């Protein structure tokens, strides 16, 4: 370990910043946010420094570097564009045993500034030891995406509750189990973010009074159409908090690699015409695991409320009184069409879009007359095995023979493949495609020739 990571208490303590340009301005913001009593020494100052000085937030000393300013300092930053000046500052601090950061010169500095994720009072610092600031920044961005914005409010509220929790729960084990439930309670976090004090108090009271082995909860999460980059931030947060993840065939390996490492995984692979695990059994798995007190994530491809049977699964939980929530996902129609260069609506071609299941229960029938109407786009989910029937019915009800169609296989994935033609070819085209696949019918398919961006990447 080349550097010891520490957090400094600078509130009301003298700090010196040497430099008055844009880099120095960024450092000044950090020091002011930390509550430092800041003096800035430079030949010239960017306008923002004058604003801060007029507001009494810092003191400006114009001129050459003045070593006497170090006499009362706890910490110094050298942020000029003159290497010689920066070196003088560093040397002077070394003699006085004052920690000094030299911007863009980690070898001359006695401390370095990390990339910061600020969820005060929770702080996360990321550093490459000065060897690769860009890498540290990229890691910080990933952590920013994972950590909810309201996490600081939750941490502050936890601090207010510590004494009460200690008197409520007698043992360390009980207190630990309480805090584990507390920090993953979405209802509490959302109430704090919304400043809904009544909801905060009600949720807190329930957490403090219910048995620690109380039933868990189920979160229904839409994984999106395949590309892991299309998973929502909230979806990512949920799969990284799960005790158990119940997932199906449409969830990509890339997304499963993001799941919390020690979470149990239950595969309930499903596809049109074949169910590895019957739907009722899936419902019972969710119920059984939640009743054990676990945080269960039901991870489904696309959006769970669009042909995902999410409603059926939640009805079972609702009837049993198990708490649940839903995180929407990007549905396959949206993701696959975007990655295929096919806009679902267009002023010249389609004023509406219809999402249709091609996998119907026995005896079900679609309104083919309205589906064959002009100026709309049809997207058939799970329609591959019914492609010939879809072709026949649409033609029978008046759709034009030359209506463009596209079949998108493995949409949004690196292995995505798009086969296109006209309606009279749909049944034959389907024989060239493997599941999972989506069928798009409409004049908007013609735009693919110009708008197909993904295959060029």
UniProtKB/Swiss-Prot annotation:
This protein's record includes keyword Nucleotide-binding: no
Catalysis: reaction(s): uroporphyrinogen III + 2 S-adenosyl-L-methionine = precorrin-2 + 2 S-adenosyl-L-homocysteine + H(+); precorrin-2 + NAD(+) = sirohydrochlorin + NADH + 2 H(+); siroheme + 2 H(+) = sirohydrochlorin + Fe(2+)
SUPFAM superfamilies hit by this protein: NAD(P)-binding Rossmann-fold domains, Siroheme synthase middle domains-like, Tetrapyrrole methylase
InterPro entries: 4pyrrol_Mease, 4pyrrol_Methylase_sf, 4pyrrole_Mease_sub1, 4pyrrole_Mease_sub2, CobA/CysG_C, NAD(P)-bd_dom_sf, Siro_Cobalamin_biosynth, Sirohaem_synt_dimer_dom_sf
Keywords: Cobalamin biosynthesis, Lyase, Methyltransferase, Multifunctional enzyme, NAD, Oxidoreductase, Phosphoprotein, Porphyrin biosynthesis, S-adenosyl-L-methionine, Transferase
Binding site for S-adenosyl-L-methionine: 225, 301-303, 306, 331-332, 382, 411
Biological or metabolic pathway of the protein: Cofactor biosynthesis; adenosylcobalamin biosynthesis; precorrin-2 from uroporphyrinogen III: step 1/1; Cofactor biosynthesis; adenosylcobalamin biosynthesis; sirohydrochlorin from precorrin-2: step 1/1; Porphyrin-containing compound metabolism; siroheme biosynthesis; precorrin-2 from uroporphyrinogen III: step 1/1; Porphyrin-containing compound metabolism; siroheme biosynthesis; siroheme from sirohydrochlorin: step 1/1
Enzyme Commission number, as recorded: 2.1.1.107, 1.3.1.76, 4.99.1.4
GO molecular function: NAD binding; precorrin-2 dehydrogenase activity; sirohydrochlorin ferrochelatase activity; uroporphyrin-III C-methyltransferase activity
Chain spans, region Uroporphyrinogen-III C-methyltransferase: 216-457
One Pfam family of this chain: NAD_binding_7
Binding positions for NAD(+) per the UniProt entry: 22-23, 43-44
Modified residues (Phosphoserine): 128
One of the GO biological process terms: methylation
Residue segments, region Precorrin-2 dehydrogenase /sirohydrochlorin ferrochelatase: 1-204
Record-linked Gene3D superfamilies: Cobalt-precorrin-4 Transmethylase, Domain 1, Methyltransferase, Cobalt-precorrin-4 Transmethylase, Domain 2, NAD(P)-binding Rossmann-like Domain, Sirohaem synthase, dimerisation domain, Siroheme synthase, domain 2
Catalytic center residues: 248, 270
Functional description taken from the UniProt entry: Then it catalyzes the NAD-dependent ring dehydrogenation of precorrin-2 to yield sirohydrochlorin. Finally, it catalyzes the ferrochelation of sirohydrochlorin to yield siroheme.
Family: In the N-terminal section; belongs to the precorrin-2 dehydrogenase / sirohydrochlorin ferrochelatase family.
Name of the protein described by the UniProt record: Siroheme synthase
